[in-house]
């Protein structure tokens, strides 16, 4: 029984991850999303399934963003998260082209915030949901996802990582395994 956190839990990829993870019966499934409506929708669906199938899983909806590192760390420590699936991202190519700064903040800085919180909380596994557009990127969205991947690769190679915002001598041992998956175009994703 693991404690699992899914960021972007209300999105098309995040919500499907939640459905699949539920079948594996984690002790706790934490759903984090910045959209109240999307979070409510996936929560309601999963609660119905838990009741119907008598699953021994605790669901926790967390309204929040990967741009809030303090909240991420608090959630991961409080619920002793074992695995993070980081699906929160802006993924619409034209939208990110027109909103470059927001794309960078969400896809790159949000990933950095989530990864650093995982390191600080001693999370065992961190899985980044990436995209095939990160391979030799030709657009801003693909570039932001590639930067997110490179960020995790850099953190994974550090035995004793120094995190952004660390003050003084902070001794930390990297206990987090970082992995990433690249999806192609996903049928039915918004």
Regions found by a protein language model. Name each.
Residues 110, 188-190:
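Substrate-positioning beta->alpha
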Residues 1-82:
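N-terminal Rossmann/SDR dinucleotide-binding element
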Residues 67, 134, 186-188:
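Conserved sequence/active-site signature of Rossmann-fold short-chain dehydrogenase/reductase
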Residues 17, 42-44, 72-75, 95-98, ...:
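Short acidic, glycine/serine/threonine-rich loops at helix termini
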Residues 11, 37, 70, 112, ...:
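Feature representing long, continuous alpha-helical segments
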Residues 86, 90-150, 154-168, 178:
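Conserved Rossmann-fold NAD(P)-dependent oxidoreductase catalytic core, especially the SDR/UDP-sugar
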Residues 22-24, 54-57, 94-98, 174-180:
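Gly-rich Lys/Arg/Thr-decorated short loops/hinges at beta-loop-alpha junctions or inter-strand turns
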Residues 61-63, 128, 180:
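Conserved beta-strand scaffold in the Rossmann-like NAD(H)/NADP(H)-binding core
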